[in-house]
């Protein structure tokens, strides 16, 4: 059993001039990194603890677990620490394997990840038709950057291996299935100004200037089977 702690400090990290957000938190949903003016004025920190333990070691059965609690934060233009886009807080892995006769091995891993932070949109600005037409998308509310969180996610992966030994090399045949029970993880929602038929949704109170926003729930995750061959010389 082991328990370790870590702490890392960042100084002079690039900070976007236009929206006041650290480039460390800019994923594909916020724009392309490198195409905007920045200042080397940001700070960041990453810290946490990691726990490892062998739960069971009996004959050919091995079960281990690792758990990490961590925080990843970077300052905004006001110097306030905000969660980075990778600040999921919790990471748990439960790993088990069993060696059968004749070089067969079966293993499984269950993984749990805390919900990632995401940023709401500025509804007042996004429902303004003139503003929407400039970017043709909803406006991120950077004043509430990463203030919301997605639900936690988890999945089970399983694998079976067969090793065949030759004089000068080893053949490893394997079959792997990721996300066995087909868990669908929640992604940040998608915002559109169109209905299901593709028509712009005018606001009846002010159809010339305002529009309605439709929120679409987004999910990812699928069962992914793989078979392969590994040759070791």
Predicted regions and their residues:
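Extracytoplasmic loops and strand-loop junctions of Gram-negative outer membrane beta-barrel proteins
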Residues: 30-38, 75-79, 138-145, 208-214
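Flexible, surface-exposed loop regions and adjacent strand-edge segments
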Residues: 17-27, 34, 70-71, 79-87, ...
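Transmembrane beta-strands of outer-membrane beta-barrel proteins
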Residues: 1-3, 63-65, 94, 106-108, ...
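Short, contiguous acidic/charged loop-to-helix segments that flank catalytic cores in large enzymes
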Residues: 41, 80-85, 144-150, 215-217
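Asparagine-centered polar/low-complexity signal
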Residues: 40, 93, 146, 179-185
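C-terminal beta-signal and adjacent terminal beta-strands/loops
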Residues: 11, 111-136, 151-155, 162-233
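Conserved small-residue
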Residues: 17-30, 103-150
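Gram-negative outer-membrane beta-barrel transporters
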Residues: 6-10, 19, 28-117
């Amino acid at each position: 059993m082991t328990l370790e702690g870590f702490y890392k400090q960042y100084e002079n990290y690039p900070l976007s001039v236009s929206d006041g957000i650290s480039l460390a938190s800019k994923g594909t949903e916020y724009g392309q990194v490198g195409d905007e003016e920045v200042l080397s004025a940001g700070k960041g920190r990453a810290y946490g603890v990691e726990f490892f333990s062998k739960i069971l070691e009996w004959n050919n059965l091995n079960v281990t677990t690792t758990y990490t609690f961590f925080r990843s934060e970077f300052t905004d233009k006001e110097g306030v620490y905000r969660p980075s886009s990778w600040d999921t807080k919790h990471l748990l892995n439960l790993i088990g394997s069993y060696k059968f006769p004749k070089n067969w091995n079966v293993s499984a891993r269950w993984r749990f990840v805390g919900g990632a932070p995401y940023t709401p949109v500025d509804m007042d600005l996004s429902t303004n038709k003139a503003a929407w037409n400039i970017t043709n998308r909803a406006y991120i509310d950077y004043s509430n950057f990463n203030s919301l969180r997605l639900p936690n996610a988890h999945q089970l992966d399983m694998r079976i291996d067969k090793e065949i030994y030759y004089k000068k090399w080893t053949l490893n045949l394997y079959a792997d299935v990721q996300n066995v029970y087909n868990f669908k993880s929640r992604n940040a929602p998608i915002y559109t100004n169109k209905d299901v038929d593709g028509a712009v949704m005018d606001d009846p109170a002010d159809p010339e200037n305002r529009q309605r926003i439709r929120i679409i729930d987004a999910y990812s995750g699928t069962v992914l089977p793989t078979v392969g061959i590994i040759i070791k010389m």
